[in-house]
Amino acid sequence: IPLRLVGSEMCISDSSNPHPHGQIWAQKSIPQEVKKKQFNLKKYYAENNESLLSAYLKKELKVKERIICQNESFVALVPFWATWPFEAMIISKTHYKSILELSENEIIDFASILKTLTIKYDNLFQTPFPYSSGIHQAPTNNNLNSEWHMHMSFYPPLLRSSSVKKFMVGYEMFGEPQRDITPEHAAEKLRNCSEIHFSSVM
């Protein structure tokens, strides 16, 4: 059974529910997007004996320009394939298939980087920053699923200010998504945001 943990912050993201809320989805079948991801993860792992996200994270840590912040256990970055202007991922530095494998210290580090990233989001436009987020991890089907590397993705809709939202329309609906700013520029803007929430210094 694939389990997905998803959450939304503020109603502008994707719902009419005006408060932050979370959901846990469990299904008998794997959704198409996740199935495609699993196929590619499995193929890479079989060929390289390493998780795709482990290899990807090594490259990002060398380049550094898309890194937002990091701590001992996790890295927050803007992936080079990001669709949303300030899309981000939190990836564990150690290859864990599931959030259930984290140690007590790693859980604290996960909470810490989650707090840092969401404060930076709020500070970007000095507003409670809307986003949808979700954790992808190995299915609970009793298989090894060694190819999976748990990660959390954030899809925020804001573009240039607290009132300008990105819409997927026209060519983006019928062709492919277009980026309004580069992942490198988005990461730089978020990296330069304070880790102290704007509301506490006003």
Enumerate the predicted regions with their spans.
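Long, well-ordered alpha-helical scaffolding segments within enzyme catalytic domains
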Residues: 50, 102-128
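Short beta-strand/loop segment at the start of cytosolic alpha/beta domains
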Residues: 65-79
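Single conserved hydrophobic/aromatic residue that forms the stacking wall/gate
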Residues: 1-7, 12
